[in-house]
A protein has these predicted regions:
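Short acidic/histidine-rich active-site segments
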Residues: 43-59, 149
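A mobile, often basic/glycine-rich helix-loop segment
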Residues: 55-82
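A conserved beta-strand->alpha-helix junction
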Residues: 1-19, 98-114
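Adenosyl-5′-phosphate
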Residues: 28, 45-47, 79-257
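ATP-dependent adenylation/nucleotidyltransferase module used to activate substrates
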Residues: 1-14, 27-49, 136, 189
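Short, hinge-like loop/turn segments at secondary-structure boundaries
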Residues: 16-20, 63-66
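Short catalytic/ligand-binding loop motif for oxyanion handling, primarily in non-cytosolic enzymes
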Residues: 8-12, 54-58, 63, 206
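Acceptor-substrate binding/catalytic loop of class I
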Residues: 22-26
């Protein structure tokens, strides 16, 4: 079992951002970079389970009605809060939401749907394709960049297009049998894995909720906002400073922004 301390995760944030080369996922990136470097000390190749949740229906938005039917990217929670942190001359929340809404409408219009599909099946197909084309692609890109930065090759067998094409056309009842997420994959692994692993509840990628990590990030943000940097030129200094000084910045730790 590998563990990463608050200081390790915070210290690697700049490196993770550099290797990601685009807006990323903070501690979700830096902790993965840390873990990949630890694995690389003993191994050059690893196998990862990325893509199984998107294909076999492991995320809550595949079975929670309020998420699967919300009419937007189901993993996004109030993006206007994040958009409001930009300076008005750089990006306005209204423009950002219009862009996201247009992207969502285009994404769902591209989902392959059969004439015989009922509303539940259509919603499930949309959740699958949104997850594969957006959520999964983001996680694969993150995995590639963090692992390669550690000189570790990570293979993703579930990303085989033949698996996606086959499972996509299976009914939801097969993939979500008896209300159990990824039930098809669990059944396929019977006899190959111990029962306590085979039937355990999904455990998401570990992200920190530590107050120590939060304190370190507050200090880093505070320092950056007081510099004459590009970061300070696109982010509203007053709003971010107010957030830093506030009691609740829990959304900084959310897996997907």
């Amino acid at each position: 079992i590998l563990t990463a301390g608050d200081r390790d995760v915070a210290k690697l944030l700049p490196e993770a951002a550099y290797f990601r080369d685009m807006p990323g996922q903070a501690d979700i990136d830096s902790s993965l970079l840390y873990f990949c470097r630890q694995v690389r000390k003993s191994h050059t190749v690893a196998i990862s389970g990325e893509c199984s949740d998107e294909i076999f229906g492991g995320y809550p938005w595949f079975y929670r009605p309020e998420m699967i039917n919300r009419g937007f990217f189901p993993w996004m929670h109030d993006p206007t809060v994040r958009l409001s942190l930009f300076r008005d001359e750089f990006a306005r929340p209204k423009d950002g939401m219009e862009f996201l809404s247009a992207a969502y409408k285009k994404a769902v219009s591209d989902v392959p749907i059969a004439d015989s599909d009922d509303d539940e099946t259509i919603a499930y197909r949309r959740a699958t394709m949104l997850s594969v084309n957006y959520f999964m692609s983001n996680l694969l890109e993150r995995k590639d960049r963090m692992s390669m930065a550690a000189s570790l090759e990570v293979r993703v067998p579930f990303a085989d297009h033949r698996i996606i094409e086959f499972v996509y056309d299976l009914p939801k009842s097969v993939k979500f049998e008896n209300g159990v997420e990824k039930s098809l994959l669990r059944r396929a692994a019977e006899g190959l894995l111990p029962d306590n692993i085979l039937h355990r509840k999904k455990s998401p990628y570990p992200k920190t909720h530590s107050k120590g990590y939060e304190r370190l990030v507050r200090e880093m943000l505070d320092s950056k906002m007081r510099e004459d940097s590009f970061f300070a030129s696109v982010i509203d200094r007053k709003k971010v400073c107010a957030m830093i000084d506030g009691d609740d910045i829990t959304w900084l730790g959310q897996l997907m922004s």
